[in-house]
Amino acid sequence: MSKRSKACDISPKVKKKVWERDNHCCIICGSPYAMPNAHYIARSQGGLGIEQNIVTLCMRCHNDYDNGNSRVSTGYKIQWYLKSCYENWNEKDLIYKKEMINK
């Protein structure tokens, strides 16, 4: 596994923290049938598997965010939510950079 892939993976520890932070439900629709595995900044764009970049979404909302017409509006909702959870939240801190991994 590459360093980037490892950095973008979501660890069980992060999933647990996000699940608790998100009150065990989808942050968009409130469904309890959800999982803490949605990247705000996509893995394909270098989005890290850190709690500041991960949210709990149900399958429908996750699919709409990844593939649907509501990507922009859902993205704004996720962004607002994460900003409300983390005082110094910044999108730039959510993206993999080679220099962040110990050499």
Question: Whereabouts are the PLM-identified features?
Answer:
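Short recognition patches in nucleic-acid-associated and regulatory proteins
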Residues: 34-44
